């Protein structure tokens, strides 16, 4: 289950469906990814074809990333069976 968001626009999108805080053309894919993340109990549950799940390094060590589109990524970490600090970023 998703416990916390780092990106406020992503949190609004997840709770209301409003796309104001995200790239509108990413809405469909983000919706699928957020629903999957909300059901996930470990990072491996997000290892779906085309999502390119991978662990992050450096300052984001302990976080995971899945590809949304181009350079955009959905990043998160798991504490127990819950996802937290869910972020939507262009970090490349």
Label every model-predicted segment.
Residues 64-92:
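Enriched for short, Lys/Arg-rich terminal
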Residues 2-4, 41, 61-68, 78:
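Alpha-helical interaction segments
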Residues 6, 49-52, 87:
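A secondary-structure boundary/capping signal
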Residues 32-35, 54, 74:
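N-terminal, well-ordered alpha-helical segments
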Residues 1-33:
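Arg/Lys-rich, positively charged N-terminal/basic patches that mediate binding to nucleic acids
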Residues 41-64:
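A short, surface-exposed loop/turn module that caps and links secondary-structure elements
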Residues 27-41, 46:
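PIN-domain endoribonuclease scaffold, especially VapC-family toxins
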